[in-house]
């Protein structure tokens, strides 16, 4: 009985190990990703969508062909256009909606009023957690490069924008999936151009 108890205690406190970081974007092609080829393209070492000349007609997503569970994701991004309307985001623990251009899952949001926030796309359709306006005023950079770090471990989700922790969220709904694809978004409804690069992921696992 004592041996079993010690095992349960040990197993409950297993350290989380990170694999070597892997790049999800080769800087030249969209290999490993799937999406509307009329929307998504590669320019100067970045994944690009949208336009500064015409409004983006609808939400579009570029999705990984692989699914992920626990991980730490780092993405460098830039958003341009109408500052009040331009919006984008990085989806994770997400799935494609069959026969539809939309996806469903968590999003690290980008844009006026949403910087650094955790949004639930096409599911609960609301901001789940986010930083104060004062934090965003000091952290977010429109029309310049920004860094998002997204860390998922079990039901814990943390977001960092340019090194500042903006979300520390615990998902209480056990029905919400803890695995899924990663996707890049350009939001419809405004003149928006979004660029993503330096996309790396470290998959996390418990030490045996």
Describe every region a protein language model picked out.
Residues 1-5:
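Positively charged n-region of N-terminal signal peptides that target proteins for export
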Residues 6-8, 206:
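Compositionally biased regions
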Residues 18-208:
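Carbohydrate-interacting regions of secretory-pathway proteins
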Residues 9-18:
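Hydrophobic h-region of N-terminal signal peptides that target proteins for export
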């Amino acid at each position: 009985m004592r041996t079993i108890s010690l095992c349960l205690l040990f197993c409950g406190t297993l350290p989380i190990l990170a694999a070597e970081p892997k790049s999800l974007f080769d800087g030249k092609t969209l290999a490993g990703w799937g999406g509307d080829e009329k929307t998504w393209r590669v320019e100067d070492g970045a994944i690009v969508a949208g336009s500064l000349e015409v409004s983006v007609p609808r939400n579009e997503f570029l999705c990984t062909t692989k699914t992920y569970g626990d991980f730490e994701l780092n993405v460098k991004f830039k958003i341009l256009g109408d500052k009040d309307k331009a919006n984008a985001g990085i989806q994770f623990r997400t799935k494609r909606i069959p026969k539809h251009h939309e996806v469903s899952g968590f999003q690290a949001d980008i844009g006026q009023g949403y910087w650094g926030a955790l949004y639930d796309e096409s599911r609960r359709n609301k901001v789940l957690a986010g930083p104060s306006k004062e934090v965003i005023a000091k952290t977010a950079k429109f029309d310049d490069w920004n860094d998002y770090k997204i860390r998922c471990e079990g039901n814990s989700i943390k977001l960092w924008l340019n090194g500042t922790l903006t979300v520390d969220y615990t998902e209480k709904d056990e029905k919400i999936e803890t695995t899924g694809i990663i996707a890049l978004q350009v939001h419809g409804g405004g003149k928006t151009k979004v660029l993503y690069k330096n996309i790396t992921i470290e998959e996390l696992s418990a030490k045996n």
